[in-house]
UniProtKB/Swiss-Prot annotation:
GO terms for molecular function: rRNA binding; structural constituent of ribosome. Belongs to the bacterial ribosomal protein bL20 family. Keywords: Chloroplast, Plastid, Ribonucleoprotein, Ribosomal protein, RNA-binding, rRNA-binding. PROSITE patterns: RIBOSOMAL_L20. Its main location: plastid. This is Large ribosomal subunit protein bL20c. SUPFAM superfamilies: Ribosomal protein L20.
Length: 113
């Protein structure tokens, strides 16, 4: 069996990881072995946090809607229930934007429910 010298391929693989870690601090961007571990950990975090991001934004929207709706004497769950009874199909993102950017329209929406 012939000998395979991996100089070019190995260097290319290592440089790819080190380039990805360029913005990391200390040895996480300098030494390959530590940088590789940190790169794998960063990929795990990014995978996990893509799901968390959706959850966090939904939580933010609900909090914003609840804060505005309480000033009208309702709470979030009753408001959403009244929207469903009135066949008004608006998602939480749109309701949150409406509440913060256009309070007059949101006021009309609450009066309509």
């Amino acid at each position: 069996m012939t000998r395979v010298k991996r100089g070019y391929v190995a260097r290319k693989r290592r440089n790819k990881i080190l380039r990805a870690n360029r913005s990391f601090r200390g040895t996480h961007s300098k030494l390959f072995r530590i940088a590789n571990q940190q790169h794998m950990k960063a990929l795990r975090y990014s995978y996990r946090d893509r799901a968390c991001k959706k959850r966090d934004f939904r939580h933010l929207w609900i909090t914003r809607i609840n804060a505005v709706v309480r000033s009208y004497g309702l709470n979030y769950s009753r408001f959403m229930h009244q929207l469903r009874l009135g066949n008004m199909v608006l998602n939480r993102k749109v309701l949150s934007q409406l509440a913060s950017l256009d309070p007059a329209s949101f006021n009309r929406l609450i009066r309509a429910t």
